[in-house]
UniProtKB/Swiss-Prot annotation:
One of its GO terms (biological process) is regulation of cell shape. It is found in: Cell inner membrane. This is UDP-N-acetylglucosamine--N-acetylmuramyl-(pentapeptide) pyrophosphoryl-undecaprenol N-acetylglucosamine transferase. The keyword Membrane applies. NCBIfam families: murG. One of its GO terms (cellular component) is plasma membrane. It comes from Citrifermentans bemidjiense (strain ATCC BAA-1014 / DSM 16622 / JCM 12645 / Bem). Belongs to the glycosyltransferase 28 family. MurG subfamily. It is a peripheral membrane protein. GO terms for molecular function: UDP-N-acetyl-D-glucosamine:N-acetylmuramoyl-L-alanyl-D-glutamyl-meso-2,6-diaminopimelyl-D-alanyl-D-alanine-diphosphoundecaprenol 4-beta-N-acetylglucosaminlytransferase activity; undecaprenyldiphospho-muramoylpentapeptide beta-N-acetylglucosaminyltransferase activity. InterPro entries: GlcNAc_MurG (IPR006009), Glyco_trans_28_C (IPR007235), GlycoTrans_28_N (IPR004276). It catalyses: di-trans,octa-cis-undecaprenyl diphospho-N-acetyl-alpha-D-muramoyl-L-alanyl-D-glutamyl-meso-2,6-diaminopimeloyl-D-alanyl-D-alanine + UDP-N-acetyl-alpha-D-glucosamine = di-trans,octa-cis-undecaprenyl diphospho-[N-acetyl-alpha-D-glucosaminyl-(1->4)]-N-acetyl-alpha-D-muramoyl-L-alanyl-D-glutamyl-meso-2,6-diaminopimeloyl-D-alanyl-D-alanine + UDP + H(+).
Length: 358
């Protein structure tokens, strides 16, 4: 069988697609996968390095644009639709899966016009406009959070969870916490980092002076902010490993007692799979404020803590860190609740559902 996985742009869209691709390829040596994305997305840089086939099309969003840019974007979408039909004719897939991102819509709509079975996966609690529209034209919708169910036709919607990269699942080893041990904090803001989160950690350090000797911090900053953050830790005498990018996230999760992070859907899938207590700082400019809704989904189940960026100060962040550090039973309860929300077989469920409907 042949599968096209369309979308990307960010790791939050791409990584679930990679997990599905790996599961599909593992089912049979005769199976083939082709990714379709745009040259500006993370897929153009990452997928060739990982050995996956990738076709590129023209596509961009329209939300928040002026009239001229919307017209230009519509032109790219029409051209992308034409490119998509050509790709479908050449690759001849049995199945198409849209995982979100600009490339998802042209391929899924072209597949509908050519009678190819097509599906979408929604990672977030609150779907974006593209997936809400595409949900009317597909044979199945896979969702990661129950809050998304009401946005799609009930008869074709399946709760699967968000597929997780196999290296996260296979490589994760829980760190055994002991009384009097150091307390390890993992900080990251997505694959590109998050300057506001980085600054908040540095602003929190004076308020953590009393536990300086116990803290061990691993901080993924993004490439642009690494030097500034590293100097900030050194100036205040805190032991921290500052990295522009963490290659082995499974080891980073395993070593962490607490995670400070954004609330993208892939991040939430990974931290729940690893049973980590988190302080979520949702990115306030995410489409339809979906990161806040993602975080709220966990906070309402006592499976995480949230600080909105508008309320974020170094003092407030330090207070939350100290509260969880000094009350291990409270942190353990959050970890237990987070782990209970994990759906480790999401990729298997999606592949099985697509194949069974073919």
């Amino acid at each position: 069988m042949r599968l096209i996985i369309a979308g990307g742009g960010t790791g939050g869209h791409l990584f679930p697609g990679i997990a599905v691709a790996d599961e599909f390829l593992a089912r049979s040596p005769e199976n083939e996968v082709l990714f379709v994305g745009t040259e500006r997305g993370i897929e153009a840089r990452l997928l060739p390095k990982l050995g996956y086939k990738l076709a590129l099309i023209s596509a961009s969003g329209m939300k928040g644009m002026g009239t001229i840019k919307k017209i230009m974007s519509a032109g790219r979408l029409l051209y992308g639709y034409s490119q998509s039909r050509k790709i479908l004719k050449e690759f001849r897939p049995d199945l198409v899966l849209g995982v979100g991102g600009y490339a998802s819509a042209p391929i899924v709509l072209a597949a509908r016009g050519m009678g190819i079975r097509r599906f979408i996966h929604e990672q977030n609690a609150f779907p974006g406009l593209t997936n809400k529209v595409l949900g009317r034209f597909v044979d199945g919708v896979f969702i990661s959070m129950p809050e998304a169910e009401s946005f799609f036709p009930k008869e074709m919607t399946q709760m699967t969870g968000n597929p997780i990269r196999k290296e996260i699942l296979w490589g994760f080893q829980e760190r055994v916490r002991s009384i009097g041990d150091t307390f390890s904090i993992l900080v990251f803001g997505g694959s590109a980092g998050a300057q506001r989160v980085n600054s908040a950690l540095l602003e929190a350090l004076p308020h953590l002076e009393g536990v300086k000797g116990k803290l061990r911090i691993t901080h993924q900053t993004g490439e642009k902010d690494a030097a500034r953050v590293r100097e900030g830790y050194q100036a205040q005498g805190f032991q921290a490993q500052v990295l522009s990018f963490i290659d082995d996230m499974s080891a980073a999760y395993g070593a962490a007692d607490l995670v400070v992070c954004r609330a993208g859907a892939t991040t939430i899938a990974e931290v729940t799979a690893c049973g980590k207590g988190c302080i979520f700082i949702p990115f306030p400019y995410a489409a339809d404020d979906h990161q806040r809704k993602n975080a709220e989904s966990l906070v309402h189940k006592n499976a995480g803590v949230m600080i909105l960026e508008e309320d974020l100060t170094g003092e407030r962040l330090a207070a939350k860190i100290l509260e969880l550090m000094e009350h291990p039973a409270e942190l353990a309860e959050i970890e237990k609740n987070a782990r209970a929300l994990a759906q480790l077989d999401a990729a298997q469920a999606i592949v099985s559902a697509m194949v069974s409907k073919n």
